[in-house]
Structures are given as structure tokens and as C-alpha cells.
Amino acid sequence: SDVYALKKEDELISIAVILHIDRKTLELKNIVTKENYRNKGYAKTLLKSLCGNYKQKYDRMLVGTTENNIPFYVKQGFDKYEKTIKNFFIDNYKEEIKDGELTCTDLIYYSKDLKKK
């Protein structure tokens, strides 16, 4: 795995974790931005940089997300639906996982073609 951080004047703003699946595929395992910096484009900037860095060696990047975050990833080019793992968050976590006000249940995978312009 690779871990990336976006800082602003020595303050950690966003962090991302990339898992190498095979010789041509990566998975964005997590990307998170500090609460007081959200909705200001930091995650978008970090993700764009990661895609740019990896496109020379890899063909596609996967992301598993919740329904609430799909619009963000589609705007970033993750436009191909791959699969849904039903009840992922219920089956794999003892405590309820929330995304804002929504309770997370399914893990939904999308992919981005890193070679596409």
C-alpha cells in the first residue's frame, strides 16, 4: 500500500491510501479530509494528483464507496460501475458505520480508466 498526504503549512489536510491489486489495477482504499477543510476541493486535488502519477504504469483505479459518495467519484471520472457487495458494512463492522446522517450498508465499486483523456 501507498499512503499520501496533502498538507497546508505543515497541517495535514487530506490523506489517501492506494492498494496495488495487480500489475495494471489499483484500488483507492480510503481518502479523507479534515472536517473543517471539507468541500473545498482538497480531496479532488489529491485524487487528481494520484491518478496523474499512476497513469503511466497502471490502466485503472477502483474505488469502493457508499451510495452517498458516488456523485463525487463519478465527477472525478470513476464512471464504470463494477459491483456491489451487499451488507458489507453490516457484516464487517461491529458498530454502525455512518456517512453523514446515512447508515452505511453496501459497498459499491466503480472504476476509472487512467489512460482515458
Regions picked out by a protein language model, each given a short descriptive name:
Residues Y37-S49:
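Conserved acetyl-CoA pyrophosphate-binding loop and the N-cap/start of the following alpha-helix
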Residues K7-E9, K112-D113:
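Active-site beta-strand termini and strand-to-loop segments that position acidic
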Residues Y54-E67:
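Conserved GNAT acetyl-CoA-binding A-motif
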Residues E67-N92:
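Conserved active-site alpha-helix within GNAT-family acetyltransferase domains
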Residues A5, E11-H20, T25-V32:
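Conserved beta-strand in the GNAT
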Residues S1-V3, T103-Y110:
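Short hydrophobic/aromatic beta-strand or adjacent loop that forms the aromatic wall/cage
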Residues D91-D99:
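Low-complexity, intrinsically disordered Gly/Pro/Thr-rich segments
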